[in-house]
Amino acid sequence: MAVPKKKTSKTKRDQRKANWKHQAALEAQKALSLGKSILTGRSTFVYPQDEAEDEDE
């Protein structure tokens, strides 16, 4: 007979949610920073290009 799993505590749920939001905030900050640097021309970022796209052109 199937037995239900234990309920996850609110603390554990909140920790996971906080971690997820923190990681999302860091990625958003990196994306914004990259966008700003590209617009100002200070970027040293090189866009990766697929070899398949180069062959088509």
Curated annotation (Swiss-Prot):
Keywords: Ribonucleoprotein, Ribosomal protein. Residues 1-20 have a biased composition (Basic residues). GO terms for cellular component: large ribosomal subunit. It comes from the Bacteria. The keyword Translocase does not apply. InterPro entries: Ribosomal_bL32, Ribosomal_bL32_plant/cyanobact, Ribosomal_zn-bd. It holds the Pfam family Ribosomal_L32p. Residues 1-21 are annotated as: Disordered. GO terms for molecular function: structural constituent of ribosome. GO terms for biological process: translation. Belongs to the bacterial ribosomal protein bL32 family. This is Large ribosomal subunit protein bL32. It comes from Rippkaea orientalis (strain PCC 8801 / RF-1).
